[in-house]
């Protein structure tokens, strides 16, 4: 939208702002009618992508809100995620631990030293305290079993 405004201003300097915004509205309506712009599809596909990267449900919800997706579509997407996997946050937190080498992936001698730091990393990633604590309390054998299932 910004680029379209800039393009129209440079090519046609006599156009006023009202005409530009009207033109943009017409283009957006046309794209929505032809289903090139679809919030529901965007919400579902972006959520799948974020889950694959290990994002928490809270992080997915906040990301979609910042992108301007309607609350109705966000709730549908979140409910669909919860139906597919009841404890999605747990598995996403495991992926974060594997990627950042924290929690159960650390050496047993260093785990107590880094417990608070690891808890903070998981909290900033959007995981609840209970989920983070459950992940950090796993021993190495349980962690390896869970990773083999993913």
Functional labels for PLM-detected ranges:
Residues 1-150:
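An alpha-helical, amphipathic repeat domain used for nucleic-acid recognition
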């Amino acid at each position: 939208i910004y680029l379209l405004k800039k393009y129209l201003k440079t090519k046609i300097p006599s156009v006023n702002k009202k005409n530009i915004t009207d033109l943009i509205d017409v283009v957006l309506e046309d794209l929505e009618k032809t289903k090139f712009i679809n919030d529901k599809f965007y919400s579902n596909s972006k959520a799948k992508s974020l889950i694959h990267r290990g994002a928490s449900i809270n992080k997915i919800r906040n990301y979609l809100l910042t992108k301007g997706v309607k609350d109705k579509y966000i709730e549908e997407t979140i409910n669909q995620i919860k139906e597919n996997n009841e404890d999605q946050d747990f598995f996403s937190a495991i992926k974060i631990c594997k990627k950042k080498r924290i929690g159960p992936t650390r050496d047993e001698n260093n785990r107590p030293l880094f417990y608070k730091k690891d808890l903070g990393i998981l909290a900033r990633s959007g995981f609840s305290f209970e989920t983070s604590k459950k992940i950090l309390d796993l021993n190495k054998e349980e962690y390896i079993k869970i990773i083999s299932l993913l």
